[in-house]
Every structure is written in C-alpha cells, then in structure tokens.
Swiss-Prot record:
Belongs to the RNase H family. It comes from Phenylobacterium zucineum (strain HLK1). Mg(2+) 1 binds at D10, E48, D70. Mg(2+) 2 binds at D10, D134. Pfam families: RNase_H. GO terms for biological process: DNA replication, removal of RNA primer. It catalyses: Endonucleolytic cleavage to 5'-phosphomonoester. The gene is rnhA. Its cofactor is Mg(2+). Its EC number is 3.1.26.4. This is Ribonuclease H. Residues 1-142 form the RNase H type-1 domain.
Length: 153
C-alpha cells in the first residue's frame, strides 16, 4: 500500500530535562509542510512523542501514513509496550505509572485515526529528511530556550 503522506519526525533537548524542541516534515505528493515547536522545560522523549503527535494531528482527514522516527523510545513504545500498558490501565509490567502517559494517550488517539506504518531510521546518519526534521527540532529548542531566558514559559 503506497502511503498518502510520508512523515519524518525528531525531538531535541538541551539538558534532559531542559528546554526542548520537536520537528516534523509532512510530504503529500509534491507538497511539503514543516512543523516545529518547543517547551521551556521538558525531556527528549517528550519531544520525540510530541513530534509524532503534532504531525498526525495536523492531518485533516484519515490517511495512509508512513512515519519515520529515529527514536527507539517511540518505535518500541508504539510496537511493543503500548498494548500492555493499555491492558494494565497505563501501568508498566512493574505496576508503576507509565512515564509520559499523557502524550502516549494522545499519540494513541492520533494514530487510530490513520493507517500508520511506523519506520525507524538511524539518526544523525546523513538521511536528508531526518536531518531536516532534526534541524526543525533544534529550531524549536532554540525558540523555547530564548523564551525561557526572556522569562517566558
């Protein structure tokens, strides 16, 4: 099945926790859309999740999606862990609350609107679209860090 939309996502954080950013590139035919944002106090994993969430939520109608991430956390979470978490009421196998469950729940809802083929791509390995997503995440991080330094949230 050929995807209607191809997405590349990335997250970045300066300090973990610290200011962070996320970036996404959405490709539909010949059209591209770039998204980025950031938070003054966050973690790298939260930014990786937010990149995928924002990209999927930006789609106006249900689509066939090929989503590329360099995050093992997102990849393993969506393929291996989420099913057990949901069965256990968002608890880990050790009966502890799932970290970032607010974002995992949001990602779960966003992905269920679409047919998503999740693809892992090696980060910082010269893949053009992954590098562009990384640059967008760093832009979001810079903007969040500047807002934090200026006293904003």
């Amino acid at each position: 099945m050929t995807p209607e939309v191809v997405i590349y996502t990335d997250g970045a954080c300066s300090g973990n926790p610290g200011p962070g950013g996320w970036g996404a590139i959405l490709i539909h035919g010949e059209r591209e859309k770039e998204l980025c944002g950031g938070e003054a106090a966050t973690t790298n994993n939260r930014m990786e999740l937010m990149a995928a969430i924002q990209a999927l939520e930006a789609l106006k109608r249900p689509c066939r999606v090929e989503l590329h991430t360099d995050s093992q956390y997102v990849q393993k979470g969506i393929h291996e862990w989420i099913h057990g978490w949901k069965k256990r009421g968002w608890l880990t196998a050790d009966k502890k609350p799932v970290k970032n469950d607010d974002l995992w729940k949001r990602l779960d809802a966003a992905r269920l609107r679409h047919h998503v083929d999740w693809r892992w791509v090696k980060g910082h390995a010269g893949h053009e679209l992954n590098e562009r997503a990384d640059a967008l995440a760093r832009k979001g991080l810079s903007e969040a860090a500047a807002a934090r330094a200026a006293g904003g949230a």
